[in-house]
Amino acid sequence: MNADLILFNGQFHTVDRENPRASAVAISNGRFVAVGTDAEAMALRGSGTQVIDLKGRCVIPGLNDSHLHLIRGGLNYNLELRWEGVPSLADALRMLKDQADRTPTPQWVRVVGGWNEFQFAEKRMPTLEELNQAAPDTPVFVLHLYDRALLNRAALRVAGYTRNTPNPPGGEIVRDANGEPTGMLVARPNAMILYSTLAKGPKLPLEYQVNSTRQFMRELNRLGLTSAIDAGGGFQNYPDDYQVIEQLAKDQQLTVRIAYNLFTQKPKEELTDFKNWTSSVTLHQGDDYLRHNGAGEMLVFSAADFEDFLEPRPDLPQTMEDELEPVVRHLVEQRWPFRLHATYNESISRMLDVFEKVNRDIPFNGLPWFFDHAETITPQNIERVRALGGGIAIQDRMAFQGEYFVERYGAKAAEATPPIKRMLAEGVPVGAGTDATRVSSYNPWTSLYWMVSGRTVGGLELHAEGLSRQTALELFTHGSAWFSSEQGKKGMIKVGQLADVAALSADFFSVDEEAIKWIESVLTVVGGKVVYAAGDFEKLGPASVPVLPDWSPVVKVPGHWRPTSPMQTQVHHCSGPCGVHSHSHDKARLSNAPVSDFAGFWGAFGCSCFAF
């Protein structure tokens, strides 16, 4: 047998405990056929074999996000300006102004998730007046975690919010002394006001949604992600909003493997939704690139406990158990796996009561099910999860909300939030993920950094000793495979498994902790095919697809901020008046000139600010 692809001269970390290290792999028909030495892989070389010298790069199994809103995120990716990783608010506001200047009527500028104020040098959020100055005429919507959204005056007008607009249930339209909306929307604690407002913005046409999803997958491939479990999401209707991803699958253009769960959209009609789906959708229908994965993360709306740590923990309504039980009972009867969003231990206790009651009547008997999030779950409830054969999918929400959690509950409580080590010690399946794109970043390296370092994106230490790098990697690969019932099929670099790997820009196992969050892939392989390549390997990868529309934020800001990005020569980095020149700070920040270009005339003197 001749291999289709051989990768050699690498430092492979296989996540296979029986064969943890290798220098080469051979791949045939999309699966590993040899994992070992260069000589062992080269023995399968034929005349048509592609051979790639990895030049000593660290290579890992392709990362697998156990909770990513990829389908919804893909439809909107080309509409959204990314503030993920941006080092200062001054930079972020300048990016916002630049995009507002490029955005045609009636489109909005949207900053949706992946950032918080603690990442900025200024350690604060933008003010509403700053948004109005940056974009006086273009509608701007800035989403901040699950707790609030900022709208400029133009966005308030097109959204139709006036002094006569009532507050929706669970939300607040903040008003000034005269009763006029200020532009601040607050979840108290329900985030529906934020998402329903976002949904008022224009959508991309189908052709552009296809392009948008391809751009998002390319960005995920750049970060070494090769698989994801899509958790559904609000305003993500089945089957309408799955048209794009199904077309890409049909055209063999998926570069990320997707297992998708179905998320109910109709309060008080959840059971009807699931009865319709279990009768029309075959469990696990699809293939290794796109397959159905069961129900959730929303099973009933009364069981949703949004994790807004700026607000007190919400008590779920007394009707929750009566509404959740028939849905779970139906899913167990139909042998449909399910997942359920649950942040707080108090919620989890009540949900487990329902699960145990159903299990007494209709045994789960190995049916895959799991909680998503579980930040404050107790050891007792971890044991109950294990007894029912469940798992826990954890995400890095504390990396973005840790400061708020500590402020409300204290540093001691944050030390084991979520209690990943206890979950592992109890033998509960654990998979890692991000919960991107509306709150956390989709960057898996931000998540891996948080798991290893115990720090937030703002640098706050939540716990002194994080997970080992090996354990963190296992959770983001082999661990996540359990949550789509694909354990043994992917997650390891092992003979017989799907050939998904990422060669990294730096050695994850030896770089300084702070450098982890800047790692990316230089060569990403899915099913034995190169889907992304950069640096020394760039010529081996497919060409990038032009971004549509041409005014999309992705044209100038192609994803997560990068320390070596050309954007650095365009943004203004200082956060206070220049001590030398005492220039007009806002004028400099809001200018379209490259005010921090150290190769320019003023930059040669150490500061371009003097131009202002």
PLM feature segments, named:
Residues E270, S302-F306, E383, Y404, ...:
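Short conserved micro-motifs at the rims of enzyme active sites and ligand-binding pockets
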Residues N2-F8, H13, R17-N276, R291-S347, ...:
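Divalent metal-binding segments
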Residues R329-R339, T343-W369, H373-A374, P379-E383, ...:
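His/Asp/Glu-enriched, well-ordered alpha-helical/loop segment
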Residues K268-Q285, A393:
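Substrate-binding cleft/loops of secretory-pathway carbohydrate-active enzymes
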